Every structure is written in C-alpha cells, then in structure tokens.
A protein has these predicted regions:
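RNA pseudouridine synthases
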Residues: 1-157
Length: 157
C-alpha cells in the first residue's frame, strides 16, 4: 500500500488508532465494476495462522467497507474506499470476496498484468490533534504507477 502512513508516538495517539478515531480514505483500482455507484460491503474476516492473508469466515471479526466508484475503465474501476473497521488486509480481502480483486494483488487473485503491486493507496488521513484539538488532514497524491492506469481508455470511450 502506498500513501499516507500514521504512527503512534504515545499512548493517547495509540488509543486514537485502536478506537478507530483516525479516518483514512483510500483509492483503489479494482477488477471489473460494481453494479451500484456506491455501497457498503459487510463481511467477517479471519486471519490465516501466519497472518499473511485474511479470508471471509462466519467466525471472523466484523468488517465494514464503504466504496464509491470514481471512474470506470475497460475491465477495471477506480474507487474511493473508507473503512469503519481496521482489519488485516480488509480492503484487499473484501474486494476479492465480492468479486473485484485489486489490480496487482496476486495474493487475492488480482491480475499483475498492468501493475505489479496491489493498486491500493492511502489518499488521506484525518484525526484530531491531541493537544490543540484541531482536525488535521494529511493527504498524498496517487503514485505514478496508479496514475498511469488512469490514462487508459475509460469504459465510455
């Protein structure tokens, strides 16, 4: 995953992370396209014993992923994603489960023909500063490899 990364330097910041008080916005490029322009995907994810992969399981932890389609291309879509829960590989595993693995995500069945890594980017992170109580938003532009995919023909061309 490329983009913004947040580290906790103290217990208060760590509590914000674990309590899901930090809002992350992701950009992903998925295989195919959703029928609806936006939606909420819910499932239960469980880690494999070595935590290399997550999979949907009835005894997994609840997982909520919201998406909004930004652009549709021939064979894939650019989507905006936010997560209400923070599970290991949540976006990757959820998109694959719903039939739309990330481009470049070999672990979850995505094609590596157009990009060699999972096409997932943390576009922004928003949180309340622990001392000033002001909302801080940090953002990061899409990396070159994902920008190149945006230059391919759109589905309506």
């Amino acid at each position: 995953v490329s983009g913004v990364m947040v580290y906790a330097k103290n217990k208060h910041a760590a509590a914000q992370l674990s309590d899901h008080q930090i809002r992350k916005q992701y950009t992903a490029i998925i295989t195919g396209q959703f029928e609806e322009p936006s939606g909420r995907l819910e499932c239960r994810l469980k880690k494999t014993p070595y935590e290399r992969q997550a999979f949907v399981s009835d005894d997994g932890k609840a997982c909520i992923t919201d998406y909004e389609v930004q652009e549709v291309y021939v064979g894939y879509s650019l989507i905006s994603v936010s997560i209400a829960t923070g599970r290991t590989h949540q976006i990757r595993a959820t998109m694959a489960y719903y039939g739309h693995p990330l481009l470049g995500d070999k672990l979850y069945g995505g094609s590596t023909e157009l990009i060699r890594r999972p096409a997932l980017h943390c576009s922004s992170v928003a949180f309340v500063h622990p001392k000033t109580k002001k909302k801080i938003t940090v953002s990061c532009d899409l990396p070159h490899d994902m920008l190149q995919l945006k230059s391919l023909p759109a589905d309506n061309e």
